[in-house]
Amino acid sequence: MRIGIYPGTFDPITLGHIDVIKKSLKLVDKVIVATTYNINKEYFFTIDERIEIIKKSLFNDLKLNKKKIEIISFDTLTINLCKKYKAKIIIRGLRAVSDFEYEFQLAGMNRKLSSNIETIFLMSDVENQ
């Protein structure tokens, strides 16, 4: 089974995030949407609220397959999360060229930490950015 981890704060989840999730479902058998907490960042919603909003958006509103999507919170390195769930793919969304530099560096660091885990970049459709 091909498992992908889609990490982010999702505060709140957007149409762009949802578009990336839908596109990633065409590439992997299961997507783990992993929301995190950063003490250096202010949030609109708590972790529990974000998880509930994600569930409602994906399962109630869009009726996406619950067997293909898992929603979790995490407080570790994404690479550690990949190892825990046996995921070989990290899914990242790009909105603009300005996102690429940061994401490229992050992907390189993750590659050094675990060479068998790939990062893929997906762009949401223009109307969802």
Residue ranges and their predicted role:
Residues M1-Q129:
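Nucleotidyltransferase catalytic core that binds NTPs
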